[in-house]
Each structure stands twice: as C-alpha cells, then as structure tokens.
C-alpha cells in the first residue's frame, strides 16, 4: 500500500463581518476561494477549526445539537446545485412542507399546504406543481422550488450560494 500525507487547505482565514436585519451582503471571489465553505460554516453544516459564528448573540459553534436544530428555522440556505438539493422521492409540495413539519410552523397540515402553494406562486410556478416530482422540472424551475423551500419558515437569515446561477438569464437580474 502506498500512503500519502494528509494535507489541509485553509479555505477561509481571518474573516469577520456583521449583517444586520434588512441588509444584504454579497461575497465575491474566484472559484474555489471558499465562498461555499464559508456559507456552510455559517450554518454549522461544516464545523470551523477555530473562531466564532455569532447569530443573535449566541456563538453557534458552542451550541449543543438540540439548540442548533431549533435555530435552523431562522437560518436557511439555497444551495448552488438544485439537482442535488431536492429529494427525488418527494413531491415538490412535500419538499417545501418538510421544514414546516419539522418545526411545526404553521401547525396544521392544511395551513402548510396553503403556504407551500403560496410560495410556489411567489417564485413564479403554478401551485399545482406541488403534486409533481423534481425530475419534472428544469434546473431553473428546481432552483425556484429551492428558493420557495428556504422561505417556508420565514427565516431571519438566508444564505444564497450562487442561487441564481441555475435560473434563466431573464430572471437572474
């Protein structure tokens, strides 16, 4: 067997910023510079080796899993690749309602269905799309579904990881 030394690459180093309610912050950088890694670290999908991620006064890196799970309703992400972001076995409606069911917001199934239909319409899709599966949609339509899903819980903070790259050029602006 041949062995290789494990090498570590510092994707994000010495970064600090504040984002206040109502503000938008854009990160720009070349491919591979760590933008997606930073996004995943902010949401604690990747644990940082050092430093803090503070949201509403709490250091997310120090929170137990149960507390972080409760906070996830306020922290959402729209991933870059809509093809891998949706479960192919779930209808679009089920995918949008899943975070609502996990967090019990709204409480009734009917209210969740109505919210999912409303969100689909808000992103330019017909409410009847709820009964279809992800493979029945184009990449741009799937990305709209992912955007609708990220809005389902009315989060306080949304990270968009190149979320418009899969949308039609006419919609990107």
Roles of regions detected by a PLM:
Residues 1-173:
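ABC transporter nucleotide-binding domains
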């Amino acid at each position: 067997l041949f062995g290789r030394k494990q090498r570590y690459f510092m994707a994000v180093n010495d970064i600090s910023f504040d984002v206040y309610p109502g503000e938008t912050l854009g990160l720009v950088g070349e491919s591979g510079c760590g933008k997606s890694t930073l996004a995943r670290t902010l949401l604690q999908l990747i644990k940082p080796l050092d430093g803090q991620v503070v949201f509403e006064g709490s250091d997310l890196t120090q929170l137990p899993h149960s507390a972080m799970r409760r906070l996830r309703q306020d922290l959402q992400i729209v991933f870059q690749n809509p093809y891998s972001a949706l479960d192919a076995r779930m209808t679009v409606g089920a995918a949008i309602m899943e975070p609502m069911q996990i967090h019990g917001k709204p409480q009734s199934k009917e209210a969740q269905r109505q919210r999912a239909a409303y969100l689909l319409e808000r992103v330019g899709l017909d409410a009847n799309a709820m009964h279809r599966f992800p493979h029945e949609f184009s990449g741009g339509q799937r990305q709209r579904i992912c955007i609708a899903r990220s809005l389902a819980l009315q989060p306080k903070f949304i990270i968009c990881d190149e979320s418009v790259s899969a949308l039609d050029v006419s919609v990107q602006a």
